[in-house]
């Protein structure tokens, strides 16, 4: 036998198969982690925006409805620091039939056209939080 060094094709294929198997096992956990982290980011943005709404209420005795296109107070309408990296678009509206003097509801919509449109949250979907403390969905994992 001569002094050849290197790997045979069979050895390379075995290593490649092992790497693919490990990646296939790790990918679902990684994807679930990304969704959870984006959800936490959205919840944090909702809480921060609600605090801004409460400050506005203390000055004006009413809350402010806003959206990405209509935002006179420049409240945060996206979940991350940069809209292009955000997973949720945030807006505010009156709660049901109540006026803005009584209640405001913040809505975080995942994967809209103004933010990362590829993002989906199959467990929680759209998150809502109102000034009376009611939030939906009520699933505990959505608010952790």
Each language-model region and where it sits:
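N-terminal single-pass transmembrane signal-anchor helix
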Residues: 1-33
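Residues at secondary-structure transition points
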Residues: 4, 33-40, 44, 99, ...
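Aromatic side chains
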Residues: 7, 30-33, 57, 63, ...
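Membrane-proximal N-terminal amphipathic helix
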Residues: 35-62
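Periplasmic/extracellular, small/polar-rich flexible segments of pilin-like filament-forming proteins
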Residues: 59-144
């Amino acid at each position: 036998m001569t002094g050849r060094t290197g790997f045979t094709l069979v050895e390379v294929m075995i290593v490649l198969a092992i790497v693919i198997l490990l990646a296939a096992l790790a990918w679902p956990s990684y994807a679930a982690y990304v969704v959870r982290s984006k959800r936490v980011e959205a919840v944090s943005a909702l809480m921060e925006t609600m605090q801004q709404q409460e400050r506005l209420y203390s000055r004006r005795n009413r809350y402010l409805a806003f959206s990405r296109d209509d935002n006179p107070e420049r409240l945060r309408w996206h979940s991350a620091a940069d809209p292009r990296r955000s997973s949720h678009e945030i807006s505010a509206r009156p709660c049901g039939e109540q006026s803005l003097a009584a209640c405001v509801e913040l809505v975080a919509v995942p994967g809209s056209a103004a933010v990362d449109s590829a993002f989906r949250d199959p467990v929680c979907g759209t998150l809502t939080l109102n000034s009376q403390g009611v939030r939906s969905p009520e699933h505990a994992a959505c608010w952790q």
